[in-house]
């Protein structure tokens, strides 16, 4: 089932609290954006009827920051299964600026 799933993209509603003292989205906030995309991905593909029924362990996370997101940017997060094994799978993410497609992370 997971192997056939295509890229899933959501728009992120940036919040004022996401912005740090330097005027851009704080590095830790990107994980929250990915979490939101991941849960919507699971619900869209009916992994279970509710999030409480999804059994998985998040074992590893890494992010390559490419450019900054600033207040007013329209951010999108794409998620897709990039590797599927017998007992585990890897989800990949791409965070972009919606208006111009600029790669953020």
Q: What are the language-model segments listed below?
A:
Residues 2-60:
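Hot-dog-fold acyl-thioester-processing enzymes
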Residues 2-10, 60, 65, 69-74, ...:
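HotDog/MaoC-like acyl-thioester-processing domains
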């Amino acid at each position: 089932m997971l192997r056939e799933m295509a890229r899933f993209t959501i728009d992120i509603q940036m919040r004022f609290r996401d912005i740090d003292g330097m005027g851009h989205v704080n590095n830790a906030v990107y994980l929250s954006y990915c979490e939101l995309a991941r849960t919507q991905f699971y619900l869209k593909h009916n992994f279970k009827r509710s999030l409480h029924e999804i059994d998985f362990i998040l074992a590893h996370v890494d992010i390559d920051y490419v450019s900054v997101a600033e207040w007013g940017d329209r951010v999108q997060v794409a998620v897709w299964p990039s590797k599927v094994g017998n007992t585990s799978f890897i989800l990949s993410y791409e965070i972009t600026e919606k208006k111009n497609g600029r790669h953020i992370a």
